[in-house]
């Protein structure tokens, strides 16, 4: 089964991400990974992780739940990344970010 990413929220201090996805139904996944799942990406879940662009990546999925608009709004409002000031300076202001390559292109 292929899943399509609608939107992703990253918490850079702990490496946890949440993605709104579409599979058989709209869902929210809570996971930890070294990769970023940008909106529009299509992946297939497999036992050790996911297959994205014909390559397998490890991913730890903590929970999958039916999409809930209120929960997604709460997650989006608590999003730490990217901070608004970074758009002006092109620099990440998070000193404790554990993500090695910024998905937003910040330095």
From Swiss-Prot:
Task: Please list the GO biological process terms of this entry.
Answer: cellular response to starvation
Q: Which InterPro entries does this UniProt record tie to the protein?
A: Anti-adapter_IraM, PmrD_sf
Compartment annotation = Cytoplasm
Q: Which cysteines are joined by disulfide bonds?
A: none
Major location (coarse): cytoplasm
UniProt keyword annotations, A-Z: Cytoplasm, Stress response
User: Which NCBIfam families does the UniProt entry name for this protein?
Assistant: PRK09919.1
Any idea what this protein is called?
Anti-adapter protein IraM
> What is the role of the protein in this entry?
Inhibits RpoS proteolysis by regulating RssB activity, thereby increasing the stability of the sigma stress factor RpoS during magnesium starvation.
A Gene Ontology cellular component where this protein is annotated is: cytoplasm
Origin, by domain of life? Bacteria
**HAMAP family recorded for this chain?**
Anti_adapt_IraM
The family annotation for this protein states:
Belongs to the IraM/RssC family.
State the Gene3D superfamilies in the record: 2.40.50.650
């Amino acid at each position: 089964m292929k899943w399509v990413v609608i939107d992703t929220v990253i918490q850079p201090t702990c490496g946890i991400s949440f993605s709104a996805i579409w599979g058989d139904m709209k869902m929210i996944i809570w996971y930890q990974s070294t990769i970023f799942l940008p909106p529009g990406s299509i992946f297939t879940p497999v036992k050790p992780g996911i297959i994205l662009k014909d390559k397998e990546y490890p991913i730890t999925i903590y929970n999958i739940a039916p999409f809930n608009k209120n929960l997604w709004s709460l997650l989006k409002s608590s999003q730490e990344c990217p901070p608004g000031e970074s758009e002006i300076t092109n620099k990440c202001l998070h000193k404790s970010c554990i993500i090695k390559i910024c998905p937003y292109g910040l330095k």
